[in-house]
């Protein structure tokens, strides 16, 4: 198996009496951007946390290159992730935030300037991160994810807080990652962005896969991805206390 491949198989997880993941299975292959969509509470963020070894499951496996995250030899060189753009120390500059991560993960500090340029933070990287807009915090989080030059990227709602210029940049950035042969899993509520970014789409609801295919396959005979999504998720929206924010947002 290619070291970039994400393979999720039969994930089952409960939060109390609520079944959050119900036999969830899908694969993210190298050289593709896979869009991961579903209503609030569907299990998207929980699934990403399971893949990254942050949550346990009752059953099933989540593998990266054939191994669970906990058994990766150097996780940040193999997997980069953005789950929460607010996971930073606001009193640190963006640059010092990245340097701290690099040192703690035994990555070259020289990568800091490279990833800063990659995400377009410019001189803002010298300012305290607590003063960043959400879009800038997203860029900082992506820079952190890229420090290890990983072959696999997992990003939860990276378009959030982006202005039009930022959205255009993000499209090109994600497509560029896939063109380099990386496997990219991206969740998003902005369905209008996915046709310009994703090769493959996984739609989930109530912890189950509702559809899994290429954009062409999913939209065959329908006018848009939004139409497909609404058809599939009608009846799969259930706002549940404690689960609606995926437990972790």
PLM segments and residue spans:
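Conserved beta-strand-loop-alpha-helix hinge in the C-terminal portion
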Residues: 208-230
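A general boundary/transition motif marking the beginning of the first structured unit of a protein
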Residues: 89, 217-220, 241
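Active-site/binding-pocket entry motifs
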Residues: 88, 235-238
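ABC transporter nucleotide-binding domains
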Residues: 3-6, 13-186, 191-205, 210-211
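ABC-family P-loop ATPase nucleotide-binding domain
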Residues: 1-12, 238-249
